[in-house]
Curated annotation (Swiss-Prot):
GO MF annotation, one: rRNA (cytosine-N4-)-methyltransferase activity
Protein name per UniProt: Ribosomal RNA small subunit methyltransferase H
NCBIfam families reported for this sequence: 16S rRNA (cytosine(1402)-N(4))-methyltransferase RsmH (TIGR00006)
Record organism: Caldicellulosiruptor bescii (strain ATCC BAA-1888 / DSM 6725 / KCTC 15123 / Z-1320) (Anaerocellum thermophilum)
Record localization: Cytoplasm
């Protein structure tokens, strides 16, 4: 049985729940850790919608919630949260929780092809019913596109070198496995000073491309804001700077009253403030949490409340 330890569990759920009788969304169900805690905190009148695009995670995680009747688990991407809520006849919610990134199930299960340490087919799909795989990205994307993805999504300064080497290698034989790709990158890139694996940034970049992760986040944040009732909250846990930047900028933009240029004396944009930022600085894991769950070390929780 795979176990995914929920990150910032108490902090995120305590910020999320403002009304025990309210309607909440766990947009990243995973193995159900956050959902279970939410259900423990809300009343029998409260209701939880849990979403995940990983069918395997849902099958494993739903066992934790068998005792609860006030929950609906849905296989979908969180960017479709508006459609899901409309189908359920829900007009407003009291809060939504996002826990971005890859789960321990996806990382630890060898055949899912997420890990640079375990040999598997280059897959990396969070939703195994989707078509695009890491194999497709690595073997069919142009050198220019590969370089752009690795630089932008992986923040990898050796992106050009890596992209060129991938194209050269695949011209002789397709790159089929995680360890093939990982070994190739390791032969090109010095080990980072922070001790992380040389292939970590490139694998992150390819995973983000395969799953459209950053676009999903942007779409889901916008849609969820429309469904939040006044006083409802968005809680977002990110694990790298790209995710965190999207959340931070989204909260900032929607907390502003006017976005007209400063040289315009009278507001013409008509923009209204929609959010109050609750966490002026992101909440990070305690030393104790990091020691017990090393994967939590980069987590950041940001919270905003609907005006």
């Amino acid at each position: 049985m795979f176990e995914h330890i929920p990150v910032l569990l108490e902090e995120s759920v305590s910020f999320l729940i403002t009304n025990p009788d309210g309607i909440y969304v766990d947009a990243t169900f995973g193995l159900g850790g956050h959902s279970k805690r939410i259900l423990e905190k809300i009343s029998n009148k409260g209701f939880l919608i849990a979403i995940d695009r990983d069918l395997e995670a849902i099958e494993l995680g739903k066992r934790k919630l068998e005792a609860y009747k006030n929950v609906k688990i849905v296989h979908s991407s969180f960017s479709k949260v508006d459609e899901l809520l409309e189908c359920l006849g829900i007009e407003k919610i009291d809060g939504i929780l996002f826990d971005f990134g890859v789960s321990s199930l996806q990382l630890d299960k060898q055949e899912r092809g997420f890990s640079y340490n375990k040999e598997a087919f280059l897959d990396m799909r969070m939703d195994t019913t989707s078509k695009l795989t890491a194999y497709d990205v690595v073997n069919f994307y142009s050198q220019e596109d590969l370089e752009k993805i690795i630089r932008e999504y992986g923040e990898e300064r050796f992106a050009r070198r890596i992209a060129k080497a991938i194209v050269e290698r695949r011209s002789k034989k397709p790159i089929e496995t995680t360890t093939e790709l990982s070994s190739l990158i390791s032969s090109l890139v010095p080990r980072p000073k922070d001790g992380s694996h040389p292939a970590q940034r490139t694998f992150q970049a390819i995973r983000i491309e395969v799953n459209g992760e950053l676009d999903e986040i942007k779409i889901a944040l916008e849609k969820s804001l429309r469904f939040l009732r006044s006083g409802g909250r968005i809680c977002a846990i990110s694990f790298h700077s790209l995710e965190d930047r999207i959340v931070k900028e989204f909260f900032k933009f929607h907390s502003l009253e006017c976005v007209c240029p400063k040289d315009i004396p009278v507001c013409r944009c008509g923009k209204k403030k929609e959010l109050n930022i609750i966490t002026k600085k992101p909440i990070t894991p305690s030393k104790e949490e990091i020691e017990s769950n090393k994967r939590s070390h980069s987590a950041k929780l940001r919270v905003a409340e609907k005006v």
